[in-house]
Amino acid sequence: MSKKCNIVSNVLSTLNHKIDKVFNERYKRNILNDDSYFTRIGKKTSFRDTMKTVISFGSDSLPLEMSRYFNDKDILPITKSGFIQSRSKIKPGAFIQVMDLINKAYPCKKNYKGYRLLAVDGSDLSIAKDKKDEGSRKFNGENTKSSYMLHINCEYDILNDRYIDCVVQKYNQQDENAALVAMSDRYKGDKAIFIADRYYAAYNNMAHLKEHGHKYLIRSKDINGATSILKNYFKGKEGEFDEDVSII
């Protein structure tokens, strides 16, 4: 138990250090909408607290999440509207940069025959209603209220249970193929095998992965499908093309 507590304490200490590093290097990292934000003496909520509160969010209301982070349900150092204002000062890229620094501080050690196994997939995330944000609005039918969503594309190290990269897109502007290309272009780690579902089976994706020296395993649509790329691979051939593979 003591060992686990020490590990958690060390990780939290590292997180604090990396968040502070990102803030101290804000002029070159481009993480704030204005570099003067969070510099006023006596400010109720620091850059670190704002970042850590957002990182710790679950699915509860904002007041409850704030209470949980500050460990006091009756007295908070900042109001709900004040926190929203503080959060809006930080660019999304700040969280990606903190994630990158944490991943570098704790290198992934597990691999499969020398390769990291990186799964790429996307998922929708519900967000608060904002009538001005047409890019995130999901139309649910004539007699149904619209919902507001973001599309989250993630790169996940399967063997090390670690998120490596992320691309956030507005619901109506989502492009999973572009997200895969962006994440594969940014990846600078050890040799890897990128694993993706059939919606990623596109020549452009494969070309980008190959250009960067990555291996890939991408599920494809059935050969008889109208948009299946397998038609070009097995054109003129007959019979079955299945091949037995070992499962990790």
Q: PLM features: residue spans?
A:
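Conserved, well-structured functional cores that handle cations and Mg-NTP chemistry
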Residues: 1-248
